[in-house]
Curated annotation (Swiss-Prot):
GO terms for cellular component: cytosolic large ribosomal subunit. GO terms for molecular function: structural constituent of ribosome. Residues 1-21 are annotated as: Disordered. This is Large ribosomal subunit protein bL28. It comes from the Bacteria. It comes from Jannaschia sp. (strain CCS1). HAMAP family: Ribosomal_bL28. GO terms for biological process: translation. InterPro entries: Ribosomal_bL28 (IPR026569), Ribosomal_bL28/bL31-like_sf (IPR034704), Ribosomal_bL28_bact-type (IPR001383), Ribosomal_bL28_sf (IPR037147).
Length: 96
């Protein structure tokens, strides 16, 4: 299972642990990922995602999965999330 957020593309970063004596040792900063189930109001379905907690807060802030996907950039989304976004866009067009 990869350590990359499916909605924002946030992944591991590298850096240093720095001691009091200023000794540096390499380390990895991993994203805080959670397995969550998000529901789409337009599609009336639920989807399981592995997303960062920051992305979960953003989804809540934007008003749900449908609103988040409408504003999300295609290059940040995973292939599965991109397919879901296209389904949501089709449903919005059919509803309008």
């Amino acid at each position: 299972m990869s350590r990359v957020c499916e909605l924002t593309g946030k992944g591991p970063m590298t850096g240093n642990n720095v001691s009091h004596a200023n000794n540096k040792t390499k380390r990895r900063f991993l994203p805080n990922l959670s397995d969550v189930t998000l529901g789409s109001d337009l599609l009336d379905r639920r989807f399981k995602f592995r997303i960062s907690n920051a992305a979960l807060r953003t989804v809540d802030h934007r008003g749900g999965l449908d609103a988040f996907m409408a504003k999300a950039k295609d290059d940040e989304l995973s292939t599965r999330a991109l397919k879901i976004k296209k389904e949501i866009v089709k449903a919005q067009a059919a509803q309008a």
